[in-house]
């Protein structure tokens, strides 16, 4: 018996579609962080005041926070292939994180920085995502 094989050529994502994908992921992540009914655990999205009651300089706490946030984001955002979470600042009244993201169908890493500011998360990098 002769076996036939089918080959499918997958279309490459154009630069414009990649840019739209990146912006969409960042926008959705920012919405997830700022949602009052977020699926993420309270400490991960609220930052303050919950962060203040803990010792923000505790390296064990920082490592735990990054692991928990990474796990939750990978669960809730299926377009992310790989993720690294880093704390940029962790002080009593300041919490800044950097997400190093690899998306499916995108060969370039995406950096998304978030800062806890006046009771909500904001992004300094969303406008620059391309």
UniProtKB/Swiss-Prot annotation:
Task: Give the location in the cell.
Answer: Cytoplasm
Q: Does the entry feature the keyword Cytoplasm, yes or no?
A: yes
**GO BP:** cellular response to oxidative stress; DNA damage response
What Pfam families has UniProt attached to this entry?
GPW_gp25 (PF04965)
GO molecular function annotations of the record:
anti-sigma factor antagonist activity
UniProt xrefs under InterPro entries = Anti-adapt_IraD (IPR023776), IraD/Gp25-like (IPR007048)
Is Nucleus one of the keywords UniProt gives this record? Answer: no
Q: What does this protein do?
A: Inhibits RpoS proteolysis by regulating RssB activity, thereby increasing the stability of the sigma stress factor RpoS during oxidative stress. Its effect on RpoS stability is due to its interaction with RssB, which probably blocks the interaction of RssB with RpoS, and the consequent delivery of the RssB-RpoS complex to the ClpXP protein degradation pathway.
Indicate the quaternary assembly: Interacts with RssB.
Instruction: Report the family membership.
Output: Belongs to the GpW/Gp25 family. IraD subfamily.
Name the record gives this protein:
Anti-adapter protein IraD
């Amino acid at each position: 018996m002769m076996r036939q094989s089918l080959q499918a050529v997958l279309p490459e994502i154009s630069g414009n579609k990649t840019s739209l994908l990146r912006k969409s992921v960042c926008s959705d992540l920012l919405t997830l962080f700022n949602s009052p009914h977020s699926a993420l655990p309270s400490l991960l999205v609220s930052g303050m005041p919950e962060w203040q009651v803990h010792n923000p300089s505790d390296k064990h706490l920082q490592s735990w926070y990054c692991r928990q946030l990474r796990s939750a984001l990978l669960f809730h955002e299926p377009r992310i292939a790989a993720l690294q979470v880093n704390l940029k600042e962790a002080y009593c009244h300041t919490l800044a994180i950097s997400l190093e993201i690899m998306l499916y169908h995108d060969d370039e890493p995406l950096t998304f920085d978030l800062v806890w500011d006046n009771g909500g998360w904001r992004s300094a990098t969303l406008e620059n995502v391309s």
